[in-house]
Amino acid sequence: LVKGGAAGAGVATLATLAGCSDSDKAEIEKLQQQLASANNKISGLENSVADAEAKASEAAAVVPQKKEMVIVSTWPRDFPGLGVSAQRLAARITELSEGRLTTQYFAAGERVGAFDSFDEVASGNAQAYIAADYYWKGKHPGFAFFTTVPFGMTTVEWNAWIKFMGGQELWDEISGEYGLKALPCGATGTQMMGWFNKEIESADDLKGLKMRIPGLAGDVMAKLGASPVSLPGGQIYENLVSGAIDATEWVGPYNDYFMKFYEAAKYYYYPGFHEPGGGLSFGMNASWWGTLSNWEKAVVEAACMEEHAAQYEEAQAKNGEYLAKLINEHGVELRQLPEEIFESFGKATAEVYEETRAHSPLAKKITDHFMAALREVGGWQGIAEVAFSNHRNRILDIV
């Protein structure tokens, strides 16, 4: 029986019913009923198939498509601390998204040079960079506040500013002017002043010193007569060994150990005035960020938040161990900077902040907001954690 058969059969049957016996008529009517019933079932099946096809089409339309995410970094591949952290973050995004965001990670120099990563992402050639935003101070000095600045915030204080005191909104504003969206993705805590091939006993010893030191701290050193240089991590060692620079800051004992600076500089100075904390940046192309669903954005934010905490915690766990290695295994001389030199650092820093404020309305807005938040959160830290730590270390003879 085929659909339509009932109608055709009905016409033919009507023409012959008059000549049929009662039993034949009954049989014909029975067949007509069966044919009509079959036709109804076929129609029902067709409707069910159509409904199933429509639902399948709707389901296919809402299945998220996989997105490729090219990430460029300013750190060397497999470099302990910073480099490994960046690779871990890239892998974590893919893992948390269950493969919907597939990352391709390129370390410094593998796709573009370290300092070219900003333009690579802003142009849309890559989707994200992992870097320290103070590298982009030449584009706008306000970027420095979203890594770290002289006499600025510790990582704990900076986190509070970014998350709960309006810092992220300012970061969005300055990044947005360059087609970017940035999130915190790492931190190393308070840094050492750095590695020097001569002793530093006063501010006069900084005059003529060629030092790798980026960000606003470089401007401070310039005011004290030094010659600041901004170099990506992968180029520092060769410049220190060759004598092209006399000193360098980097991070802290854990990260510095693997750079082997001890082969070219004998003195390891602390404390650093230049990088008290802050964080690193996962800078994304803003247009690409806008194409992500809320779920995909949440995945990226969660991965960045996780790595931001992990990198900081790893540094705190390992700095003491690797400081001992530097001293005991490589004969590094740990030196404390004289108190007087901080007065010179402070005066020069105040001048740099004023120059930064004068750069533009946005630079003034960021600087003023940062300093107001610093006074508030820093004041509390002084009463609480700093005061406690000083007494604890004295009582327990920790330092």
Language model: regions and residue ranges:
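N-terminal export signals
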Residues: L1-S21
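Intrinsically disordered and other compositionally biased segments
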Residues: A7, L17, Q32, S43-L45
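N-terminal secretory/targeting leader peptides
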Residues: G8-A15, N47-A50, A54, E58-W158, ...
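Bacterial lipoprotein signal-peptidase II cleavage site
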Residues: S21-E29
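Heptad-repeat positions
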Residues: I28, L35, I42, V49-A52, ...
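Generic low-complexity segments that are intrinsically disordered, proline-rich and/or Lys/Arg-biased
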Residues: Q33-L35, F151
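Divalent-metal coordination cores built from histidine and acidic residues
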Residues: L170
